[in-house]
């Protein structure tokens, strides 16, 4: 993958985290949130298609994504820090719906987002949950990587 494509996806995740956090906290319509982000932010270097894939895909699959996370959580979904919950939703969506992205990249990007926006030690929790989910969802990829 080209560096520009990698950076564009990274920026898309960052904006998607902020947009999905806004959706979680306010319930604002996703189309309105997208319009706000495109108006307020310089999205020239953002992979806009990937941003929309996350922005619209995660709410569409939110119940299934959260159900997939439950076995690996030590608390109820509603007790999670909203940023960490949003990062977990993004990471789980990517694990299930973006097979073109290696699971290690998904984990690394999720950890980076949590370090930047989440609580001080939240990245460890996010990494542990998504690593366990990856072992189930991407079992072949994980086992090949561990050989």
Curated annotation (Swiss-Prot):
Disulfide bonds: none annotated. GO terms for cellular component: cytosol. It comes from the Bacteria. Pfam families: NusB. GO terms for biological process: DNA-templated transcription termination; transcription antitermination. InterPro entries: NusB-like_sf (IPR035926), NusB_fam (IPR011605), NusB_RsmB_TIM44 (IPR006027). One of its GO terms (molecular function) is RNA binding. Keywords: RNA-binding, Transcription, Transcription antitermination, Transcription regulation. Belongs to the NusB family. Involved in transcription antitermination. Required for transcription of ribosomal RNA (rRNA) genes. Binds specifically to the boxA antiterminator sequence of the ribosomal RNA (rrn) operons. This is Transcription antitermination protein NusB. It comes from Legionella pneumophila (strain Corby).
